[in-house]
């Protein structure tokens, strides 16, 4: 088996690894988009809740305490989601670096395979040319 043929499996494996990393990266991107939408929805809800309270006017002490507690819990939930979103973005950056490395590896192995294929083709062409030259020389000797 020629070197170029042996490298085919290495190139295929590098392509598989790159594609899998790209799939995982795309999934992480979708999850970030979903998390951003969720945080934005929670912020809108909080703003709407505050606006509704201001429109409705006064409330008794018990209602005010419940309102404050609810807003505090909602604020904590938003902070937790934002922290989770930050972790997701950091993980996404790491996945992106990993994909980039695998992409470069796949590209590099592919270039090596192409170089070896060109070398092997050159050897074949040189051998064929040598055979053609030998045949032509043999014909000249037979004629001469």
Question: Can you describe what each PLM-predicted range is?
Answer:
Residues 1-144:
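Charge-rich amphipathic alpha-helical interaction elements
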């Amino acid at each position: 088996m020629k070197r170029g043929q042996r490298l085919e499996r290495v190139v295929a494996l590098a392509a598989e690894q790159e594609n899998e990393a790209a799939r995982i990266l795309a999934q992480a991107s979708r999850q970030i988009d979903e998390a951003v939408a969720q945080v934005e929805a929670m912020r809108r809800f909080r703003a709407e809740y505050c606006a509704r309270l201001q429109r409705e006017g006064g409330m008794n002490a018990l209602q005010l305490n419940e309102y404050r507690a609810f807003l505090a819990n909602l604020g904590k939930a938003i902070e937790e989601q934002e922290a989770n979103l930050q972790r997701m973005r950091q993980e996404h950056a790491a996945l992106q670096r990993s994909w980039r490395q695998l992409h470069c590896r796949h590209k590099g192995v592919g270039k090596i395979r192409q170089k070896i294929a060109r070398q092997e083709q050159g050897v074949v062409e040189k051998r064929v040319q040598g055979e053609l030259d030998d045949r032509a020389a043999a014909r000249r000797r037979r004629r001469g």
